[in-house]
């Protein structure tokens, strides 16, 4: 039961931070949250937990907020801003990948006690980040594209571009 409560708290906290970031900093706040979420999701993806009667990675919650971010940006700032958030997430993950792999090249001090743990955690990073970034890029760019297709369809069909927000959000993200 504790895992379920922690996941619910995590979702509320992470989504709340995305909304707070947008309220305080506008697009820049969402770009920042997107970058942090993609980096941390790749680390959290190493952790498997049992919650809600299924095994899952913790990275799922952080990756989920990136869909909220692109939907907010699509709705309020436009398609270009939403795609920029996707590219920001990719760039930040590539930056993290290169930097974290460079750590493995250093010769640690004889007094170091952390390097074995760092190597254990980050030895899978390149493969995981490459795989997750490929899926992230495809799914996010498709989500943004489909969001705007739904938007054009509902505007053409009903003559109001602000109606059917629920359809744009729910019709693009699950696919």
For each predicted feature, which ranges?
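Transmembrane alpha-helix/helix-exit interface in multi-pass inner-membrane proteins
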Residues: 87, 91-110, 136, 140, ...
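Membrane-interface interhelical connector segments
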Residues: 103-127
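Transmembrane alpha-helix boundary signature
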Residues: 44-53, 76, 98-111
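Hydrophobic transmembrane alpha-helices
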Residues: 1-73, 80
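Small-residue-rich segments of transmembrane alpha-helices in multi-pass membrane proteins
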Residues: 34-46, 89-101, 170-173
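Helix-boundary and loop/linker segments of multi-pass membrane transporters
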Residues: 24, 117-123, 155-159
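Membrane-embedded alpha-helical bundles of multi-pass transporters/translocases
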Residues: 127, 131, 135, 166-167
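Internal alpha-helical transmembrane segments of multi-pass membrane proteins
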Residues: 155-174
